[in-house]
Amino acid sequence: MGLKELYESLSSEQREFQFGRIGVNPLTEGFPRKRVVHAGIDGTPVNPREAQKIWQGLMSKKPTGKPTQTAYIHIPFCKTKCLYCAFFQNGTDQAVEDAYVDSLIKDLERECHELRLKDGLIHSVFIGGGTPTSLSAQNAERLLRAIRTCLPLANDYELTLEGRIHDLVPEKMDVWMAEGVNRMSLGVQSFNTKVRRQVGRLDDKDTVLRRLEELQAYNQCVVIIDLIYGLPSQSMDVWRDDLECLMTSAADGADLYQLNVYDNSDLAKRIQAGALDPAATTKEQARMFEFGREYLMKRNCRRLSAAHWAKTNRERSLYNTLAKTGVTMFPFGSGAGGRVDGYSTMLYRTLDTYATAVEEKKKPFMALVKESDIQPLVNKTLAQIEQGYFNVDLLVGEDPRLSDLKWLYDLWEKQGLVENNGVLYKLTTAGEFWQVNLAQTTVECIQYLVKGVESMSLQGVAAQDGAETKAVSEKVEKIIAAMKKAKSSGAGPTPEAMKMMTEAMQSMSPEEMQEVMKHMGK
């Protein structure tokens, strides 16, 4: 059965959810709601008893040539929790932070001697969180020196430190610039003081602009800010002012992200209680996206990927681009994720469990998954769509069974989501807004055409439109129950739990995944 026959066999609800709506405004109504892209499909969990041996085997082999590679380092601390955030792990405590950095450096020092790492090159390092800039100046110095000592950085490496405006103080900035940070990614979210403080940001508009100038005065790094559209009290006029502030600020570029409100999140509870104005609906966010896109393009900003824009020629957004292509990503730190030579992994989220594994000279992962043999096709697909296009012929050249994808993209052309320029399909403005939906459905269709597996699901994503979603699904509850059973028996994570986790990763929202991660390794 081809894609057309599959399409015709679906219920009207599932047809619209997977393939989009016909005869509507494609920008505001192209799909019923946003989806989540699940890049890893059909993976096979490794038996926990064999996982360490397999990892050691991977790391003991020399890389083939000098492939482009990245490293992700996770700092799981925040001084405050922003209402919209699904990734908060731990508050700050100096003694806990000191001990964690000790463990993180040991993890780096142990792995740096492995051939797979030391004989290659690292082109991009991303220190994410959490709030990495919350580290004390001393701990930041220790960690950055360990990174430059342990990782084989390429001459043109990008080293990004993620953080918040409130941490931009001289004693910290001096260390960051002296120890090799050449890109700062800062969560501004909005320049509007009221909007910022409503969601947990501390500094007012003038302070934000001043501190960006103070950071840029070092002239040692790219300065990037995150802006979110759709926040409570963020009208179109406020959004316009945010974009104007971006253009006049010292930032070299920005990432424009759509707000998703998840049921049972702190933000949703505050809105439901009447303490905050409602967030923008998806239709309103679509118009904000369109306005932001046109505003930046008219001012000659360069589009680097779906959400990333450059104001100056210093910004490359290298890590963000490479992460979408499936390149090797060496993970370090509690909660970090990565992939090496056909295997993906997630490191322990619980600090004590992470530290214990490091002391035992083990890679501190809670799960190791062998990727599907069609993962390379998926990676190429996601990399293209992230850049705003899709070339069917390139994929058909690798697997003729994918020729039916032309039917899918011809359908989307009729719906106003893509345009065929004679060589490939370019996403329209509407297609760019619904890019995650196009990407996920394309991945599912690839799996269907190559594997004969229909894995399309109707999971909810955001609650800003009043849609009913569960913060903890039945699948999540089953995984947690299995992990608790393993803990009580002392046996550790079972193959059954690993299998369920792998399957769940294909269909869960970020909120659901975070709920699982809270319990993995406890």
PLM region spans:
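Flexible, acidic/Gly-rich N-terminal and inter-domain linker regions that tether
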Residues: 1-69
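Short beta-strand motif preference
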Residues: 71-73, 186, 427
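Extended, compositionally biased non-globular segments
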Residues: 463-522
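Beta-strand-connecting loop/turn residues
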Residues: 78, 252, 421-423
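Charged, E/D/K/R/S-rich low-complexity terminal regions of large eukaryotic assembly subunits
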Residues: 334-468
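C-terminal scaffold of the Radical SAM
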Residues: 92-114, 120-398
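Canonical Radical SAM [4Fe-4S] cluster-binding loop centered on the CxxxCxxC motif
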Residues: 65-102, 193
